[in-house]
Amino acid sequence: MLNIKLNIVILAAGKSTRMNSDIPKVLHLLAGKPILQYVIDTAIKLKAKCKSTNIYIVYGYKGELLQQKLAHKQKTFLHWIKQVEQSGTGHAVQQVLPFLGKDEEVLILYGDVPLISFQTLIHLLTTRSKQGLSLLTANLTNPDGYGRILYKEQEVVGIIEHQEANAQQKLISEINTGILAVSSNELKIWITKLTNNNSMNEFYLTDIIALAWQEGKKIHTIHPEKISEINGINDCAQLANLERLYQKEQAESLLRIGVIIADPNRFDLRGELKHGDNIFFDTNVLIEGQVSLGNQVTIGTGCIIKNTVIGDNVIIKPYSIIEEAHLANGSIVGPFAHLRPGSKIEENAYVGNFVEIKKSTLGKKSKVAHLSYIGDANIGKDVNIGAGTITCNYDGANKHQTIIGDNVFIGSDSQLIAPLTIGDGATIGAGTTVTSNVTSNEVIISRIRQFPIINWQRPKKKIRYNIIY
């Protein structure tokens, strides 16, 4: 626990010009989550580690949309402050000054730098001296576009923005990430001394570094553990590159703890994955939302799994889509199966090729092997659903339930017209349309009687001859 009063300022007022999109840059998705949400989540983690914390988001372009998309999740944590005119980072921070108390810590973050880690920020806060500031910097092989760190006798004396730097300064490889920790008392003084006497006519927050040095304040620098932590997003190419980098990092983290991934370059995790032992992911698997896997789970190529709980010894065959479902131990799904929200597959049940299940329970050891639609149904144990069976659950206005008992056999190409109850041990003949309840152990057949025609001959096509002269 840090015994400090912390103010986290997240700058998110940019117009996102280079994204060429009507959507604010910080609302674009990285691994399925808005870019800004990553920074907010990290800020909330810090909140739990400090004596008290306020989180301020400085917004501008389409700020109402930002609040609509994000604020509902953390209403009590976030304070939204509008920057009416975008006049640089110093001007953005100035909007927060009236809300800062005396002798408090201020941490500056950026809404378009999503992967900054909790550990790095804790390090940044703990290294700041009482009479100075801490600055997050990094050494890059290609520092183009970044402000450069200026030293004099091994002490940081300032930051020069790329567009203001001379040829010699542009050779400096240590760059400013923009992320810093500073005292509220000193920040208030230094912000008022900023000028916009530069090529962009903006108030640069980075100019407070030179002001701090001139006053003899100690300026600490630390580096992030990974360069990806400080990667900013300004255009679609940078977003795509960071997506691939982040996905590979997640895959490598899973590999290190024993999860087998056939190809880390073709694995996507857009959410949170909890898992047991002996997990195998084939290529091009997508995990979304909150997914939990038991032990001995195999997921075939091309599968999409979203907000689902999967038990032990489960096999998901290729190209299956599973969302908001529950799969019990020993179940098998696919290939080409679709489990929609509310599907519950019980122990050792089987869902096969081109089967769609929605808001239904498939009991223990029951099978729906081929080409079927099961919707709003409760199916018992040891049931066999033949190929092409459909639960007709919708009457054009309302959905109705189908209840099937234990040990029921449903023949192929049957239609079950809900609302409907089929008792234990019943048998439904192939091609039957069931319109009323079936009692236990009853056999139901409703199809046209077969009539044989003796000595019938199939019509033959006439042979046409083309004469070529």
From Swiss-Prot:
GO molecular function ontology, one term from the record: glucosamine-1-phosphate N-acetyltransferase activity
Pyrophosphorylase as annotated region, ranges: 1-236
Catalytic residues (positions): 370
UniProt-annotated stretches for the region N-acetyltransferase: 258-469
CDD domains: GT2_GlmU_N_bac, LbH_GlmU_C
Pathway, per record: Nucleotide-sugar biosynthesis; UDP-N-acetyl-alpha-D-glucosamine biosynthesis; N-acetyl-alpha-D-glucosamine 1-phosphate from alpha-D-glucosamine 6-phosphate (route II): step 2/2; Nucleotide-sugar biosynthesis; UDP-N-acetyl-alpha-D-glucosamine biosynthesis; UDP-N-acetyl-alpha-D-glucosamine from N-acetyl-alpha-D-glucosamine 1-phosphate: step 1/1; Bacterial outer membrane biogenesis; LPS lipid A biosynthesis
Residues binding Mg(2+), per UniProt: 112, 234
Biological process according to GO: cell morphogenesis; cell wall organization; lipid A biosynthetic process; peptidoglycan biosynthetic process; regulation of cell shape; UDP-N-acetylglucosamine biosynthetic process
Record keywords: Acyltransferase, Cell shape, Cell wall biogenesis/degradation, Cytoplasm, Magnesium, Metal-binding, Multifunctional enzyme, Nucleotidyltransferase, Peptidoglycan synthesis, Repeat, Transferase
One Pfam family linked to the record: Hexapep
Region ranges (Linker): 237-257
Binding site for acetyl-CoA: 387, 393-394, 412, 430, 447
Main location: cytoplasm
Function text: Catalyzes the last two sequential reactions in the de novo biosynthetic pathway for UDP-N-acetylglucosamine (UDP-GlcNAc). The C-terminal domain catalyzes the transfer of acetyl group from acetyl coenzyme A to glucosamine-1-phosphate (GlcN-1-P) to produce N-acetylglucosamine-1-phosphate (GlcNAc-1-P), which is converted into UDP-GlcNAc by the transfer of uridine 5-monophosphate (from uridine 5-triphosphate), a reaction catalyzed by the N-terminal domain.
HAMAP family recorded: GlmU (MF_01631)
Family: In the N-terminal section; belongs to the N-acetylglucosamine-1-phosphate uridyltransferase family. In the C-terminal section; belongs to the transferase hexapeptide repeat family.
Subunit structure of this chain's protein: Homotrimer.
PANTHER family cross-referenced by the UniProt entry: BIFUNCTIONAL PROTEIN GLMU (PTHR43584:SF3), NUCLEOTIDYL TRANSFERASE (PTHR43584)
Protein name: Bifunctional protein GlmU
Organism: Baumannia cicadellinicola subsp. Homalodisca coagulata
Primary gene name: glmU
